[in-house]
Amino acid sequence: MKTVVFAYHDMGCLGIEALLAAGYEISAIFTHTDNPGEKAFYGSVAHLAAERDIPVYAPDNVNHPLWVERIAQLSPEVIFSFYYRHLICDEIFQLAPAGAFNLHGSLLPKYRGRAPLNWVLVNGETETGVTLHRMVKRADAGAIVAQLRVAIAPDDIAITLHHKLCHAARQLLEQTLPAIKHGNILEIAQRENEATCFGRRTPDDSFLEWHKPASVLHNMVRAVADPWPGAFSYVGNQKFTVWSSRVHPHASKAQPGSVISVAPLLIACGDGALEIVTGQAGDGITMQGSQLAQMLGLVQGSRLNSQPACTARRRTRVLILGVNGFIGNHLTERLLREDHYEVYGLDIGSDAISRFLNHPHFHFVEGDISIHSEWIEYHVKKCDVVLPLVAIATPIEYTRNPLRVFELDFEENLRIIRYCVKYRKRIIFPSTSEVYGMCSDKYFDEDHSNLIVGPVNKPRWIYSVSKQLLDRVIWAYGEKEGLQFTLFLPFNWMGPRLDNLNAARIGSSRAITQLILNLVEGSPIKLIDGGKQKRCFTDIRDGIEALYHIIENAGNRCDGEIINIGNPENEASIEELGEMLLASFEKHPLRHHFPPFAGFRVVESSCYYGKGYQDVEHRKPSIRNAHRCLDWEPKIDMQETIDETLDFFLRTVDLTDKPS
């Protein structure tokens, strides 16, 4: 059976050996050039291919059409991937009639993504395994063909677990490859509700934060022990690496990071104590703990830092452009609730953020992003995370001012995206549920749903396509230039401070604010085209909590992801929204200050929005990516959101001239 193989590392070598032993004909092998900065303790796929007289290639981009065509010319019947580090495109999968199969180092659906070997140790797991699964567009999500469990012993470190996994993989392939060859396999779909996903790890992820329990720090040491880069800490500005450790249930009142003793070298933790058995100062040699203490000048009572003293207290700097807006001001409140964020904000007004202006970790400048380009570039360079939230996002403006929508929403934001590329800063970009347009799927899915908009002579779509093109530009920068990004798509977030009643008076607001204005002024609630259009309304608190988790980015799980943030359970038509709002209004303690309800009035969209408008019948999100990447799901019922939003706006109204 002819096959093309994508392989790297020890797993790649043993996968190739297993294929040859099972009688497969390998037409070509695709691998990687070795990274000179990486300690190469593993076997070389390139050397093995050369020894076995098999053509071997290491292209920068195997998904390029030229390489796809070359692979097609090889006419593979089946494709295998063994620890190949790049995603392989659908076009390549489809070249093999029997499909493509990948070997993954975990018990899928747990620990999808990168570095599962290290992550299971970091998280203190007692079991892992290897999985052979069918390859699909989403990484590690295809049906399972075979699995083998591997126990993780308390004394296992990364290299010993690696050897166990290699042994298990060899067994699994010996058992399974003949069945694939004869088309005799049973595939089991993965349970998406059990899936977890982890991102790549870098050496900087292995800081030892002494306020954590000793068991957690010991697991970190195990996960990145030699030949991985090692867990590390600092004495002042002197970095040292911990190669092996032991947990001591030492009851001590010492501050975390304090040296309890130097022989053995025992460090107080948030819970218990960690003995540093072996370690290394700087780029020196490995030595046992008490000698390391002497080398570092440690005595009982010395304090260790998780990072150099000069940066130990630096907060993550978050730049929010459009900080006075609905999302911006609520996000600022959530970030400042923690003690490890510094927020820098720009906007043309400050009414919604006045409560933060005296906060020591909030820095605000009043200005326009189209004018203050130098300030913005400087702060993109200065900050760690950038959220460009400035946009015209009210439907009436799409038909009333389409060019202004394009200039602000697309052109100004493109400049900010390019700053992030230039200075290698992480960008969290607010796309929109509008990008799905007139998609007919029951649930709008980030990875599979088609994005469908109307004809060019319907300017209503200029917002949608401006956002969609920016999404595609960001994605391309991520693929080609390594931009660290996450795209999030809010689905009808609502709550206090959504627009304002003055904006609603000129029609430039979202639906609920417009409806509240109608109730406050005693004017009819206008139902555009009957108000039958359905939306899924999401409480701002749920939305902001998801966005906060994106900023936190635990395990880099959000990198390169597109994430819907919405509440599919809170689906209602605009008419139903109006009825729920009216019922809440009639029960409100301030109701007697306002005019009688003037009823509902059906109006045509062309009369309300003007020429060139089209509406969407439904818009319901799939939130699988939010579950997978954020461990998030919305919790707040729509009625509670309506009640709180209405209460907020009614209490902003000057009641002196209202009837009583």
Curated annotation (Swiss-Prot):
CDD domains registered for this protein in UniProt: Arna_FMT_C (cd08702), Arna_like_SDR_e (cd05257), FMT_core_ArnA_N (cd08644)
Keywords for the protein's UniProt record, in alphabetical order: Antibiotic resistance, Lipid A biosynthesis, Lipid biosynthesis, Lipid metabolism, Lipopolysaccharide biosynthesis, Multifunctional enzyme, NAD, Oxidoreductase, Transferase
Chain segments carrying region Formyltransferase ArnAFT: 1-304
Swiss-Prot/TrEMBL site (Transition state stabilizer) positions: 102
Site for Raises pKa of active site His, residues: 140
Reaction catalysis annotation: UDP-alpha-D-glucuronate + NAD(+) = UDP-beta-L-threo-pentopyranos-4-ulose + CO2 + NADH; UDP-4-amino-4-deoxy-beta-L-arabinose + (6R)-10-formyltetrahydrofolate = UDP-4-deoxy-4-formamido-beta-L-arabinose + (6S)-5,6,7,8-tetrahydrofolate + H(+)
Listed Pfam families: Epimerase, Formyl_trans_C, Formyl_trans_N
Chain residues that bind NAD(+): 347, 368-369
GO CC terms, sorted: membrane
Region (Dehydrogenase ArnADH): 314-660
Catalytic residues (positions): 104, 434, 619
Claim: Transferase is one of the keywords in the record: yes
Residues that bind (6R)-10-formyltetrahydrofolate: 86-88, 114, 136-140
E.C. numbers: 2.1.2.13, 1.1.1.305
One function term, GO molecular function aspect: UDP-glucuronate dehydrogenase activity
Gene3D superfamilies: 3.40.50.12230, NAD(P)-binding Rossmann-like Domain (3.40.50.720)
Chain's role: Bifunctional enzyme that catalyzes the oxidative decarboxylation of UDP-glucuronic acid (UDP-GlcUA) to UDP-4-keto-arabinose (UDP-Ara4O) and the addition of a formyl group to UDP-4-amino-4-deoxy-L-arabinose (UDP-L-Ara4N) to form UDP-L-4-formamido-arabinose (UDP-L-Ara4FN). The modified arabinose is attached to lipid A and is required for resistance to polymyxin and cationic antimicrobial peptides.
Protein name as it appears in the record: Bifunctional polymyxin resistance protein ArnA
